[in-house]
């Protein structure tokens, strides 16, 4: 056994990997226009894995880790364009809906298979569907359709009524500390809404190369950078990010201490999830 509940994510980012491998041939199985079929296959395996895990240890907790996005139409869009963007926005929830058995019930999904909602959120997770345009997170005048992270997390929590984790976030380059401050401000808003908010994961904590350009392009998005001149094992602290993180950790710790719904969560009125 374990001193604490074992938290398992069977497949990371089913939505993104289904698109990458099923629609744009960017990874296995290198398909095009088959995103739904790949997603269905992922979730068939995902749900079978969850069933086996829960049978082996009823105390295991399942945490999904899916991209959290906001997909919107252009300004002055037609009713058809508005509905098209809304449909695309809704697809981000398909994999979790499958896990819960809300859609594709033949896969065996159940509400009790979802314990913790993990979401991966980056600076480019909000965009206009067509013509494609990223909605800036730090613009002097925000786009009218830009939504705060706390608002998006509220939407997801309202949909599933589960504790929330920000399972991936970071920003490349000089805006790293500003992003940490923004994410922290949103965490404070989530806590103020009395949503059970159980953690934030900075990814990468140590800088990493681009997936497609391993030897030539580093993202400079971690708390530590790597200097090629010093070798792959070099660790150079990005001090502005570290200072921002320490400051924000204190603010969040104080807010958590005042919150009454952060260590336990009543799941479906039957049992308490705990961290």
Model-derived features: positions:
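Composition- and surface-driven signal marking solvent-exposed, interaction-prone regions
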Residues: 178-180
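Active-site region of glycoside hydrolase catalytic domains
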Residues: 1-176, 185, 189-199, 203-275
């Amino acid at each position: 056994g374990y001193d604490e509940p074992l938290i398992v994510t069977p497949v990371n980012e089913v939505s993104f990997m289904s698109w990458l491998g099923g629609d744009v041939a960017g990874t296995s199985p290198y398909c095009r226009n088959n995103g739904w079929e790949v997603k269905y296959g992922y979730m068939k395996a995902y749900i079978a894995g969850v069933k086996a895990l829960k049978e082996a240890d009823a105390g295991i907790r399942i945490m999904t880790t899916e991209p959290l996005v906001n997909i919107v139409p252009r300004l002055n869009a037609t009713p058809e364009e508005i509905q098209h963007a809304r449909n695309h926005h809704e697809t981000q929830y398909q994999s979790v809906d499958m896990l819960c058995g809300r859609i594709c019930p033949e896969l065996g999904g159940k509400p009790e298979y979802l314990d913790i909602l993990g979401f991966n959120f980056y600076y480019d997770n909000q965009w206009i569907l067509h013509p494609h345009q990223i909605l800036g997170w730090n613009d002097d005048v925000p786009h009218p359709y830009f939504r705060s992270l706390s608002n998006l997390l509220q939407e997801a929590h309202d949909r599933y009524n589960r504790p929330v984790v920000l399972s991936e976030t970071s920003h490349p380059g000089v805006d790293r500390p500003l992003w940490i401050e923004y994410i922290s401000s949103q965490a404070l808003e989530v806590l103020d809404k009395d949503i059970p908010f159980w953690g934030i994961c900075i990814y990468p904590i140590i800088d990493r190369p681009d997936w497609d350009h391993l030897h030539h392009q580093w993202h400079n998005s971690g708390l530590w950078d790597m200097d090629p001149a010093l070798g792959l094992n070099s660790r150079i602290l990005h001090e502005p990010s570290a200072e921002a993180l320490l400051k924000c950790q204190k603010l969040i710790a104080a807010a958590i201490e005042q919150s009454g719904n952060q260590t336990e969560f009543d799941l479906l009125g039957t049992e308490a999830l705990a961290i």
